[in-house]
Amino acid sequence: MSIDASPSESVLESQTPDRVDESIPIKAEETEKDAAPGRDIVGFRWLLVCIAVFSANLLYGLDNTIVADIQAPIAGDFNEYTRLGWLGVGFTLGSVVFILPLGKAYAIFDTKWLFLGCLTMFAAGSALCGAAPSMNAIIVGRVWAGAGGAGMYLGNLNLITILTTPKEQPVYVGLVGLIYGTGCILGPIIGGAFSDSSATWRWSFYLNLVIFGVMSPIYVFLLPSLPRPAGEGRSFFKKLVELDWVGTVLSAGMHISIILFIVFGGVEWSWTDGRNIALYVVSAVLTIAFVLSQYFCIGTTKQDRLFPGEFLRDPTMLLLYIIMACGGAALFVAVYYIPLYFQFVHGDSGIMSAVRLLPFVCFYVATILLCGYVMPKTGYFIIWYLMSGVFMLIGAVLMYTVKLDTSPSNVYGYSILMGLGMTTTQAAYAVGPAIVTPDRVAECLQFMNIGQGQSQLLGLAIASAIFQTKTLSGLTALLGDKGYSQVDIQSAVAGAQSTLMERLPPALKTAALKVIVSSISDVYVMAISAGALYVVASCLLPRRRF
């Protein structure tokens, strides 16, 4: 199905007039080379710019998962165990809420200064997390850092696309996805290292400030000012007014109410509580209102509306969106819950449990690199997607079977299969632009960003709700009549090193661990579902070269 062309929202469209005369045929290779000059930034300056820009992307990936191994010490310091899920969900919530309006903003505001503004937001949120005096403060910091991080990620895509030549763009855009994914899987390792050291978990967040400070001179002095042609001739306030504020408010309310419903249900209050029912109704109403606002362009225009909904009418783009979402959800389940299993069952420290994630990490990185190099040469992306989905499904099913007495080597093997299943999680950033018209590439990238962000947000929220609800109910049934308080039981959910787990008699501790391991297994049901949908969607992809 064809997609009607409309003005691109980001850098790729605005870059075209500067580099390629639109009257020149796209397939005229020699003419295209003449029309596409080399990079304006070269040599050592280009190296420094790449290091600085990609380091921001790495930090964004790290902060997505860095709390996976430090939730227990954070909850212990603040004596807050029922809000553990917010440490991971808060960051992705901020990212998802802001990624759509920021994507529009990058189309009309100076890319350099908007990128710096988002970096500053991220640093401020990280500073609040590091110095947080309470759990509420750290949650606010995580949401704020996530909002800035979304802008950093979009800024990476925009900066790289502006500053590179058309021939270089696929390689550098692929690096953006690879570095982000690498950051995601290294997050638990770095967080665990800080948590187990004298620096404490707070330096997991202060690290961002150090790197931001070191790279700031490069951002300020070596990055050129990059005003967008689409925003020329209009004042700052005129540009602000043209953003889709109706869609932004409805999108924020929709995502926040959905996450509150999922995270609070069964933990802060029961699923049938009136407050939870109210949140469910509000989220449904806001979702319908958002869809209608985008379909009828209420308070905006088709060009300026927040969500590129026309891609949903294209079967291939819709399938890529679904695949992107399934991969993101399964990735976060593995990164968060493999280390948690080893902490509980083997009593591992934060750093040791994260080290046990290395088989998954190594195969993930290796296959992402292999896919990025080989898949464009073969052209038949359906094969790569299908194989990836099969490995993801098999790995998730095997992780579901893990019990208290499963050997570590078996868990490593299962995690490797899941790592192989992540091969194409970033491939849509290359496949999508190859199947849309050139003037829709920027919107395509934004479309994929939305799928990735929403899947991570919902995946983390649902996984946290499953684990906390089932573990709390199971441990309460096991220990509630044996003199242990609800606070003690909640602390056990936070980590294996809780005082309750340490003082339980051996037989009772084994029974408690079986409850916890069973809850972790149930989390993988979501990954199994994602893997199955991944396989089905892959089978429906077009059987042609790209």
Curated annotation (Swiss-Prot):
Family as reported in the entry's similarity comment: Belongs to the major facilitator superfamily. TCR/Tet family.
Cleaved signal peptide residues: none
Keywords associated with the record: Cell membrane, Membrane, Transmembrane, Transmembrane helix, Transport, Vacuole
Protein name: MFS-type transporter patC
Cell membrane listed as a keyword: yes
Pfam family, one: MFS_1
Function of the molecule: MFS-type transporter; part of the gene cluster that mediates the biosynthesis of patulin, an acetate-derived tetraketide mycotoxin produced by several fungal species that shows antimicrobial properties against several bacteria. May be involved in the secretion of E-ascladiol to be converted to patulin by the secreted patulin synthase patE.
Major location category of this protein: membrane
Basic and acidic residues composition bias: residue spans: 16-29
One annotated GO biological process: patulin biosynthetic process
